[in-house]
Amino acid sequence: MLNINFVNEESSTNQGLVVFIDEQLKLDSNLIGLDQQHHGLISKTIQNKLQFTGKYGQIKVIPSVIKSGEVRYLIIAGLGNEEKLTEAKIEELGGKILQHATGCKISTIGLKLTNRISRFTSQTFASLVASGAFLASYRFDKYRTTLKEAEKFAVESIEIFTDNSTETAKLFEIKKLIAEAVFFTRDISNEPSNIKTPQVYAERIVDILEPLGVDVDVIGEREMKNLGMGALLGVGQGSQNESKLVVMEYKGGSKDASTIALVGKGVIFDTGGISLKPSSNMHLMRYDMGGSAAVVGTIIAVAGQKLPINIVGVVGLVENMPSGNAQRPGDVVTTMSGQTAEVLNTDAEGRLVLADAVWYAQEKFKPKCVIDVATLTGAITVALGNTYAGCFSNNDELADKLIKVGEEVNEKLWRMPLHDEYDAMINSDIADMANIGNVPGAAGSCIAAHFIKRFIKDGVDWAHLDIAGVANSNKASALGPKGAVGYGVRLLEKFIKEYT
């Protein structure tokens, strides 16, 4: 794991040294001295705009021979227009620096920050750079037995010199804790589905949360049947692996404080059931539990900080498999709420899992606010691509706050519509509702949201986050490799911290 230290004295032993320069291409007094030590390499580089323009995110790595004859590397990072810098951009810059250092096989990095940059103190700026680098250091290669030497290389340490290392270290410690929660979310999402069965996943939740003071209850199929969870159980009945409902309760606030409930879809593997998916890219359905992973990761982050709030998490863990015992198109299930649902398509299973999970959360904990998170529909990816998750809500203030925080942490949300006409599209001739709409291909994400909305009680503020397009990526980003993104943890952690 990447080691990040904050120090009061500069070290001359680091292999790489990071220099920040904005689009004005001016050297302050500190950089002038450093430039002289390195034979004017910094000033020569920025004078040649074909090499370096100072635009945001531009990284230039230059080898330099110091007086001792040793080779050092100057890592010049562009800030662009300092007035346009945001916390998210600074974190991403930290990730880019780590990735370039890794590519150049630079094992130790030094970074000096003693001046305010734009509106950010040196301590805040340094902690954000460190956070981005730490997030970018994530790897999932536990099943690789033949890694090449280049693939094995990792930056060992980053040493950051600021004018108040103690304060900077405190700021980073919180960000590191949140990043480690993101790593859990990525890890469990990246795990192959033959490894992370509902039972194994539930055990991992217990192992990581109970030491943090979170009460965890793992409910099996017998108890779910007694509770009347016909919708969730119907999804999992085709699998030989028993479905689980995992309930997490963190009581950091006072007894009379309101509770927020997070509910996650945890379809461990989704074949589509009898309504079988095409085989192409079906392996990616191991990520169909990304919503549940985001919920667990958020509770790790909240409990790890010992935040003074009350929060519960409920995740339904199932496998949607075809078999002689699998749910059939046309089946009618009775949900925990007592409402019935006609299952017209067994591949619209996530909303069935959430129906019972959100109802359970409301019945047991009486939350003021429910936020469900799910890789729910392919339609949201058609609408928003891989840039935004969809946000549906019955409360404008709740939606606005979530969207604002999403912009701040670069886990973006786009408000999607709810309307009575969408709701009418899920009426069934033989049950209270159907699990798909009556107009093929129309408003798929909105239809799914309305299905869940029918299980939200009057007076409860609710938001549904459809993260199907952003939970995993087929390409690396500044903050991590391709695969599971860990989307939702930083968004929900900050929302909870600031607004509850």
Curated annotation (Swiss-Prot):
What gene, per UniProt, encodes this protein?
pepA
The identity of this protein, by name, is Probable cytosol aminopeptidase
Q: Which reaction does it catalyse?
A: Release of an N-terminal amino acid, Xaa-|-Yaa-, in which Xaa is preferably Leu, but may be other amino acids including Pro although not Arg or Lys, and Yaa may be Pro. Amino acid amides and methyl esters are also readily hydrolyzed, but rates on arylamides are exceedingly low; Release of an N-terminal amino acid, preferentially leucine, but not glutamic or aspartic acids
- Read off the Gene3D superfamilies from this record: Leucine Aminopeptidase, subunit E, domain 1, Zn peptidases
Q: Where does Mn(2+) 1 bind?
A: 270, 347, 349
Q: Which UniProt keywords apply?
A: Aminopeptidase, Cytoplasm, Hydrolase, Manganese, Metal-binding, Protease
Q: Where is the active site?
A: 277, 351
Q: Which is a GO BP term held by this UniProt record?
A: proteolysis
- One Gene Ontology cellular component annotation? cytoplasm
Q: Which cofactor is recorded for it?
A: Mn(2+)
Q: Which domain of life is it from?
A: Bacteria
Member of which family?
Belongs to the peptidase M17 family.
Going by the record, the broad EC class of this enzyme is hydrolase
Which Gene Ontology molecular function entries are recorded, alphabetically? manganese ion binding; metalloaminopeptidase activity
EC number(s) of the enzyme?
A: 3.4.11.1, 3.4.11.10
Please name the InterPro entries in this protein's record.
Leucine_aapep/pepB (IPR011356), Macro_dom-like (IPR043472), Peptidase_M17_C (IPR000819), Peptidase_M17_leu_NH2_pept (IPR023042), Peptidase_M17_N (IPR008283)
Protein localization: Cytoplasm
